[in-house]
Amino acid sequence: MKSNKAFENTVHGIFLILGLVTVACVLLITVYLVISGIPAIMEIGLWDFLFGKVWDPAASNPQFGILPFILSSIYGTAGSLVIGVPIGFFTAVYLSKKASPKVKEWMGAAVSLLAGIPSVVYGLVGMMVLVPGIRKAFNLPDGASLLAAMIVLAIMILPSIIKVSITALDAVPKEYEDASLALGATPEETWFRVSVPTAKSGIATAVVLGVGRAIGEAMAVMMVSGNVANMPKLFESVRFLTTAVSSGMGYADGLYREALFSIALVLFLFIMLINATLNFFLKGEKK
């Protein structure tokens, strides 16, 4: 009996340590980004840094305005959600509630494969197929644009949205659906008036995971967006927060390098804000 209690305490201790390691990693990343990012913001000025429209670190009078990057990231993420969320949501409803087991297995494997494709492959296919297609379709000088980034990101967030939404929908108690059907509701009415509302917290989590994937993506976006520090327009080349960091960190020094850490800090705060908003929403729904 004592040996079992000792084993149980040991396991609990190991789990506690692992949990503390996870928390410590988050705290260390936060502290490192704050320490590395604040000096540049202090030197440049918070207003000029966040709302400046010109990014030209190589000029004789360097300018470090990241408003084009912020807006490009927001517009690109929002556009990918507009495209990807409806597709992912309705696909999840179909696979969870309507598809035969064989179709569900086949499409589930395809979704898993889509999730495992490296970002650089998405970017390469987008650069070779999507970018020329946009250039020809809209008669543009260059198809590398915000629109191309939106489409690529929409495809990349589909696996997260579909898989998490399916899990949430599958977890809905069958008794709820049976009761709805017994009252005369059609299967479609039951899905969208009973199953989906019951699973809304899981579906919201799926969307937030998609947002995190979209706003944090760098390689694929850099390959299809043109990576130019312009104010965002749908058919023009743009640069996201992530691509600004990844494209400049290899050779940046001095204030330029510090400014890139500041951009990483802004990106980190964006993710924290999104997660906090989700938690607030879910707590409000539970009340």
Region locations from a protein language model:
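Cytoplasmic-entry segments and transmembrane alpha-helices of multi-pass inner-membrane transporters
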Residues: 12, 87-126
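C-terminal transmembrane helix and the adjacent membrane-cytosol boundary/short C-terminal tail
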Residues: 166-170, 174, 181, 250-287
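Transmembrane alpha-helical segments of polytopic membrane transport and secretion proteins
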Residues: 1-19, 278-287
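Transmembrane alpha-helices
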Residues: 164-165, 187-222
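Transmembrane alpha-helix signature in integral membrane proteins
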Residues: 66-94
